[in-house]
Amino acid sequence: NLRSDELTKENIIQRLRSFAQKAFRRAPVAGELEPVQKLVSQKINDGMAPLEALKLGFQSILCSPGFLYLNLGEGELNEYALASRLSYFLWSSPPDDTLLNLARIGSLRAGLSSQVKRMLSDSRSDRFVRHFVRSWLDLDNIGSMPPSQDFLVYYRDNLESAMRDETETFFRHVLDNNLPPREFLDANYSFLNRELALHYGIQGVEGNKLRRVSLSGSSRGGLLGHGAFLTASANGVDTSPVVRGIYVLEKILGYTPPPPPPDVPAVEPDIRNATTI
């Protein structure tokens, strides 16, 4: 709703600086906006409407390295770099006004704990949960290794997304309630919907929405019993304790075992019942 007749020279400069701070995720350094301001002034002098010239200035800012590249510098992060690191880590998006204002006055580092709590309570932190869990446990591999035809009858179309959602919701629950790390292994509950519960052989769960379900007396508790965990650590056809064991070592214990000695031959596949074309 902004009109050209409302834009004075001072107002244009102020709007450019405000826009640049959000685009660059920091305050513009001395002289950084001079080329943009000169461009806008030149276009206005050439007869372009101030509003159109301002839009051109915005476009120029969005084409600059300060916007296109996330350059946090070397060494200890300054306040603006800390705001960007925090925001992209927890929200996968640029810092909001609160973070930028705290960075501007130099108070972000002192209030870091309260800002982390604020950001984790925001729905945008669901992006962190999704990206972190999928990267940690390779959950994006689910679907690239479908089960063999013999088992497709047990593998419904929406199970893949439900499996991911179970693990992500479980991680979110542990995070929100500040539970100890052992909860990932010995929890006696999970978050299931009807399809996933039926796949696990659990009765009495209705609807598509995930809800907390007690698993007392079951071996399903914890990440090791999640369908997503078991699917991501398999190839969809064969059971391989070695492959799954390496997956557990790397993802849970943070240890990558060395390769087998060169004099240990590969295990030949069982082809006793195989046929040829």
Q: Where on the chain are the PLM-derived regions?
A:
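Active-site substrate-binding loop specific to GH73 endo-beta-N-acetylglucosaminidase modules
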Residues: 1-277
